[in-house]
């Protein structure tokens, strides 16, 4: 809690909880864990804390918590192994962040480009209203083997497209 407060006081607009192991919890345990985490951090800092869970987690459970009017979660990040487009209709508040595959970025440039084209086409198929609240990003962050050329291309093309 103190670290979240420090980051917000230092000027962060939103602090994300990156949870890479929530998918290992049984559904009942995930509910208990989210309840405790959100009560301790999210309620203390309304609309200032977002939550990202790695693939394999039941995102419906997180959405149910996000839609709770007492929680005020700023938004949620979606792993790249899940179709992001489904979540715009499922969430009623907060942002949806993601979710180009970080592994696609590590491909040779000529193999990376068609993957990026497909992602842009899929997201462009949604109207601006349908993708309202979208924060474009990666599924789980840039890997150390990622060619810088691909990162630059990704940023430039996303900015030009949206």
Residues of each region from the PLM?
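Active-site loop segments of alpha/beta catalytic cores
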Residues: 1-162
């Amino acid at each position: 809690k103190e670290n979240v407060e420090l980051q917000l006081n230092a000027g962060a607009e939103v602090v994300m909880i990156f949870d890479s192991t929530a998918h290992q919890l049984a559904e009942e345990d995930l509910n208990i864990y989210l309840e405790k985490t959100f009560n301790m951090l999210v309620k203390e800092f309304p609309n200032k804390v977002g939550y990202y869970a790695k693939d394999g987690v039941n995102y419906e459970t997180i959405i149910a918590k996000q839609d709770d009017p007492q929680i005020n979660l700023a938004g949620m990040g979606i792993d790249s192994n899940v179709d992001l487009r489904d979540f715009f209709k499922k969430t009623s508040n907060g942002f949806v962040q993601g979710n180009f595959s970080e592994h696609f970025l590590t491909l040779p440039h000529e193999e990376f480009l068609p993957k990026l084209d497909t992602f842009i086409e899929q997201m462009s198929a949604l109207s601006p209203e349908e993708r309202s609240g979208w924060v474009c990003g990666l599924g789980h962050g840039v890997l150390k083997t990622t060619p810088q050329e691909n990162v630059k291309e990704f940023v430039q093309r996303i900015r030009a497209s949206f």
